[in-house]
């Protein structure tokens, strides 16, 4: 079962501080970014109510919502100068980086470049694969042997079938003389996509806690001593 993405009820007020924000960025813009993240969290959690009845368009929708969170969190951190962020450490940064690469690969192959995704070789998308369709498990799909199945997760692409896969990318190799000669299925899991989004939200919550503990006078004094 996929857990709902944590929301902003866990924020402690650090992101409400005006003084840490870059001088050339308004606090209103930061609030707009936070609002975008909040609405997207709600949208992703709403989809969970019928996650077992999703369609092809729902797959695209979920991938794009997670990508919106990724982009919005990036924009949020860009609201703060380097001297504010340099001492912030996110414990799950390594896992988040793996999740980011995974999400970018999924988004590229499904939404952005289904005919020529070539920048995600660790996930099998090296420019030789074409994404023909998004499919769900059926009796017809099970007819294909294990050699026709692969799956992807945070660690990359793997041979074989993963029972945790929720949907499949139906694709074939452009290197084949006969277009369907090298047809295969790549399994993907909703839980991995939701995990990426949740890691980003958790980073925001941790950053909020970091900002709450940050005192303006102490920060200015420390930076003056460094200079």
Model-derived regions, located:
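Acidic, Ser/Thr/Gly/Pro-rich intrinsically disordered interaction regions
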Residues: 1-39, 88-227
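Short, contiguous, well-structured surface segments enriched in hydrophobic/aromatic residues
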Residues: 19-83
């Amino acid at each position: 079962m996929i857990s709902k993405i944590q929301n902003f009820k866990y924020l402690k007020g650090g992101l409400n501080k005006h003084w840490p924000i870059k001088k050339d960025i308004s606090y209103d813009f930061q609030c707009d970014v936070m609002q975008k993240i909040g609405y997207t969290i709600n949208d992703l959690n709403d989809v969970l109510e019928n996650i077992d009845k999703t369609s092809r368009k729902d797959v695209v929708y979920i991938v794009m919502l997670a990508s919106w969170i990724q982009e919005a969190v990036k924009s949020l951190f860009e609201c703060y100068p380097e001297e504010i962020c340099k001492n912030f450490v996110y414990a799950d940064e390594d896992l988040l980086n793996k999740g980011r690469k995974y999400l970018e690969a999924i988004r590229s192959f499904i939404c952005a470049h289904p005919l020529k995704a070539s920048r995600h070789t660790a996930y099998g998308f090296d420019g030789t694969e074409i994404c023909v369709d998004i499919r769900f498990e059926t009796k017809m799909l099970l007819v294909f042997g294990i050699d026709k199945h692969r799956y992807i997760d945070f660690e990359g692409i793997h041979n074989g079938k993963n029972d945790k896969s929720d949907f499949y990318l139906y694709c074939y190799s452009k290197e084949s003389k006969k277009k369907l000669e090298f047809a295969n299925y790549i399994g993907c899991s909703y839980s991995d996509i939701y995990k990426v989004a949740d890691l980003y939200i958790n980073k925001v919550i941790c950053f909020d806690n970091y900002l709450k503990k940050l005192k303006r006078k102490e920060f200015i004094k420390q930076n003056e001593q460094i200079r």
